[in-house]
Structures are given as C-alpha cells and as structure tokens.
Curated annotation (Swiss-Prot):
It comes from Rhodococcus opacus (strain B4). This is Heat-inducible transcription repressor HrcA. The gene is hrcA. The keyword Repressor applies. Pfam families: HrcA. HAMAP family: HrcA. Keywords: Repressor, Stress response, Transcription, Transcription regulation. One of its GO terms (biological process) is negative regulation of DNA-templated transcription.
Length: 347
C-alpha cells in the first residue's frame, strides 16, 4: 500500500474516532487540530474529498463536516491492527462475575448483562445448540411409587426436569433397574443420538419394566428433540434508546429505531445473525447492510461463538448503531465469550 493510501487511511481513522466520540460531523480544521497527521489542512481537505468520492465518508448536511459510511467503517475495521485489550483487573472481574453463576441460565444471564454494560450496546447470547450438546447424566427420582422425576443434565450445563406418570408402581429395586437402563442408553451421547437410543429401549426392556420404560422414553424423546438453540437471552435494550439520535435521518429508512426494536422481538432475525458465528475465537463484524436484514440497516452486529473443550455451544454478540467503538467492542465480545466457555468447561 502506498504512502498516499496510508495517509488517507489515517485521515479516515481520525474521522471515525472523532465521530464515534462526538457524534458530530467532522471537518478538516478539527482533524488538523486534534490529530497529529503531519500534513497541511489543504492536504487533509484533498484526502477527505478523495475519501468522499470513493464512498468512505459522506456529507450529511450542506454546510457540515463528514461522517463515515458503512464502507468507511468496513475499511476501518478491516485495518484494525490492535484490538484494544482489556486490563488484568477487567478480565479478573469478568471471570469472577461469571463464576458466581449458579447454573447455565445464570451464567448466560450474567454474561449478557456484563457485555451490555461493557459495550453500552444490546447484548445477546444463544442457548447451547441441540447438535452440540451431549448427555452428561440422567437422574431418576421416585416422587411417589407411581410418579417419577427425570432430571436430564447435558455437558453444556442445560438441565431439564420432567414428570413421568407410571401405570404401575415401582419398588426400589425396579427403580434402580430402570435408572440403569435409561442411563446406559443416554450417558455420553449427543442429544440426537440419545433420542434414537432411548426410543429403541422399549424393544429391549424386560417385560415387567416395559411399561415404565415406554412411558419414560416417550417423555425423554420429547425433551431431547426440543430445540434450545431457539432460546435467546437479551440484555441492554435500553442502550438503543440512549443512542436514538443514531437512528434518525437514515436515508430512506424512517422510524429505524422502532424497526430495530421490532426485529429484536423476532428471535428468528437475531438467530439468523448469530447462525454464521459458530466459531469460537473468531469475531465477526457485520456493518449496516452487511447484516442483510432490512430493519438492521442502521446497525452493526459484532458476534462470535462460545464453547467448551473445543466444542462451540452457541453464538453471542452485541448489536448497536454503526457509530460504535469497534476496537473496544470486539475485545469485550471476545473476552466475555472466552470466559463463558471457560466457566462452562469447569462444570
């Protein structure tokens, strides 16, 4: 890349930094005063004219400065050399807060709340996907001789509790045999495979336990084939309203803040944005129209996968106006995802 291109990028970087900080269009005079660009005001004006002609910046009003476009933000993000690191104290605080979660639900809720606070954006996390989870343990508890409580625990921390009404009563010995049959069919299997295994138990069960096995298997299959990946935890929605000015005046897109809020209520839209993020350790940035969601034209989505022991369990990230602190937000998303995975791996 030529020195001219490098200089023009520095001008673009300065425009992005000032606009993110002030929310005001940026002029050449302000750039020269605030940044050590090492060139004259005339050169900066010429560079800004070039950036505008190439679509990296735009003039929102006749007599104002310039603001970055989606293309400009993309160029800026693609050339971020160093993501702003979190301090040791911040990393320790994140881990301590997440480790205090009592179960999967609590850890994910804490993660979303934390990410929303760190980034001042809307944070979202997807529950562990069905295909990624395995059965860690099945507990069978007799509530009465004719009623059982099944507690299914996955390696991702998901816990499901279901009641089984029996046709016949079971004594302690029969209960232990049933527990062994069900546990043997399920333990360690991915949920899809576990569903098949438990559905085949009826043909193999001893005659005196067949009714209890069939009833238990029916409940378990229903549990195993549900889709927890359709569940989302959302936090920080109020941050959108605090940034309401960023969603006004988007050409051809009136009422955009309302449209974004409505899109957030449609979980399928958010799930679509997280669907391509099933890679822990890699942060994806979608800016404006790159989201390919009409209601999200004025937003950016920064997302990644989280997981444990090399397995990606789900996606998570933040959503906010395109005018955001990209280096800081990328660092926060990566850190919270990494520590959620670490906490889940230890359980």
């Amino acid at each position: 890349m030529s020195s001219t291109d490098d200089r023009r990028f520095e001008v673009l970087r300065a425009i992005v930094a000032d606009y993110v900080s002030t929310q005001e269009p940026v002029g050449s005079k302000a750039l020269v005063e605030r940044h050590n660009l090492g060139v004259s005001s005339a050169t900066v004006r010429n560079d800004m004219a070039f950036l505008e002609s190439e679509g990296y910046i735009a003039q929102p009003h006749t007599s104002s400065g310039r603001v970055p476009t989606d293309k400009g933000y993309r160029q800026f993000v693609d050339r971020i050399a160093d993501v702003k690191p979190l301090s040791t104290a911040e990393r320790r605080a994140i881990l301590d807060f997440l480790e205090s979660g009592v179960d999967l639900d609590d850890v994910l809720r804490r993660g979303v709340r934390l990410l929303a606070q760190l980034t001042r954006q809307v944070a979202v996390v997807q529950y562990p996907t069905l295909s990624a989870s395995s059965v860690r343990h099945l507990e069978v508890v007799a509530l009465t001789p004719a009623r059982l409580l099944l507690v299914l625990i996955t390696d991702s921390g998901r816990v499901d509790q279901r009641i089984v009404e029996l046709g016949d009563v079971l004594d302690d010995e029969d209960l232990a045999r049933l527990r062994g049959l069900l546990g043997g069919a399920l333990d360690g299997k991915r949920l899809a495979a576990a569903s098949i295994a438990v559905s085949e138990l009826a043909d193999e069960a001893p005659e005196d336990l067949r009714d209890a096995v069939v009833r238990s298997a029916t409940v378990l299959v229903e549990t195993l084939v549900e889709h927890p990946e359709e569940r989302l935890v959302l936090g920080g929605t109020a941050n959108l309203t605090r940034n309401a000015a960023d969603f006004t005046g988007i050409s051809g897109f009136p009422g955009s803040l309302r449209a974004v809020l409505e899109a957030l209520e449609e979980q399928v839209v958010v799930l679509k944005l997280l669907a391509a993020t099933q890679d822990a350790g890699t942060v994806t940035v979608r800016i404006g129209e790159e989201t390919q969601v009409e209601q999200m034209r004025g937003t950016s989505v920064i997302s990644t996968g989280y997981g444990a022991a090399g397995t990606v369990l789900g996606g998570m990230g933040v959503l906010g106006p395109t005018r955001m602190d990209y280096p800081g937000t990328i660092a926060s998303v990566a850190a919270v995802a990494r520590y959620i995975g670490q906490v889940l791996a230890e359980r």
